[in-house]
Amino acid sequence: MNVPPKQAGPSIRAIADGDTRERLICGDCGFIQYDNPKIVVGAVVLWGDRILMCKRAIEPAYGRWTIPAGYMELGETPEEGAAREALEEACAKIEIGALIGVYSVPRIGQVQMIYRATLIDGAFAAGTESLEAMLCAWDEIPWNEIAFPTVRMARDEGSRRGRAESQKILESDPGN
């Protein structure tokens, strides 16, 4: 969140000159706080015909399975972010491939970019944000324990296409 360096006065909610949306504005210095969507990056990581899955050790969706994914950091590309998340969550070094899909989740202010990737050397383990990590054959994936709908969508599209062909808009609760 951007905040003015020396905010002395109270923030007010108003529409700034030349803008069309209500935003928080510092009553003293006029600093405008823009709240923008967060970018989530991740990868459907393959090792042969198996998919790398992580069991979450953090909320939301503690104890549910997901692909390695998380918030993109400043100063990194989406591809670098997806590779970093695989290393953090599954101790996995990956080679990023094609973009599978871009998923807009406006209700929670997220844009999710999911890539196809390959595990480089077959090595993986549960990282600090994961309870477990495993390579699953398609029929071994714990379908009833998947953390987020966009994981299912990316997995399904990744298995069919391997690249992005359309943008999906998810209006439902991503925690279900």
Positions of the model-derived regions?
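Conserved Nudix-box catalytic region and its N-terminal flanking loop in Nudix hydrolases
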Residues: 46-88
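Unchanged
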Residues: 72-96, 101-157, 166, 175
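Short connector loops at helix/strand junctions that flank enzyme active sites
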Residues: 21, 36-40, 46, 60-62, ...
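Acidic, metal-coordinating catalytic segment for phosphate/diphosphate chemistry
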Residues: 2-42
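A broadly conserved sequence feature marking short terminus-proximal activation segments
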Residues: 1-16, 158-162, 170-176
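Conserved hydrophobic/aromatic beta-strand scaffold that supports enzyme active sites
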Residues: 23, 44, 53, 114-116, ...
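Short secondary-structure boundary/capping segments
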Residues: 15, 43-44, 124-127
